[in-house]
């Protein structure tokens, strides 16, 4: 298969994932029409965005896996991918420690606000990065990148699980 055909196949897969996510969100919007959607439009919009990201993230695993299969013969790609995945997983660990760290003396600082926004975004996307690392680890052609990708998967999963348990524990009634 030619390189252009491979790129076209992967691009078509991502377009299909986008179309599927858009269709699911459209069906969800149609199913939840009513006064609540009108009155609480911003909250419904945020929920629709999260639904889109979730469906697209899951559907995009297929073209992502296909692209990785096409890139299997290139060891330098796998070296860079696995090291980058480890670095990115380390940012999840850093975010976790910033989340559980004690509050600063000035609670309304701009740095804390930006850190909270970045931490929330990082937490929401963490399962998708973990799943992507797992798919890459399964497809990896050699042992070294596979192990690095599995470590990145474990870091992403453990950080997301810890944050989720922290949220559940804090919401629990006394």
Tell me what each language-model feature is.
Residues 112-113, 130-152:
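Membrane-helix boundary connector in multi-pass membrane proteins
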């Amino acid at each position: 298969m030619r390189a252009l055909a491979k790129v076209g196949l992967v691009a078509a897969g991502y377009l299909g994932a986008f179309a599927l996510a858009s269709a699911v969100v459209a069906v969800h919007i149609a199913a939840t029409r009513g006064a609540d959607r009108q009155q609480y439009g911003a909250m419904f919009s945020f929920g629709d965005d999260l639904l889109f990201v979730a469906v697209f993230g899951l559907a995009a695993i297929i073209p992502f896996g296909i692209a990785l299969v096409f890139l299997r013969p290139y060891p330098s790609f796998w070296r860079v991918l696995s090291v980058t995945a480890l670095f990115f997983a380390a940012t999840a660990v850093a975010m976790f420690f910033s989340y559980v760290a004690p509050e600063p003396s000035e609670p309304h600082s701009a740095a804390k606000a930006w850190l909270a926004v970045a931490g929330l975004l990082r937490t929401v996307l963490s399962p998708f990065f973990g799943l992507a690392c797992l798919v890459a680890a399964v497809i990896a052609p050699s042992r070294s990148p596979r192990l690095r990708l599995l470590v990145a998967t474990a870091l992403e999963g453990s950080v997301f699980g810890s944050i989720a348990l922290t949220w559940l524990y804090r919401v629990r009634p006394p």
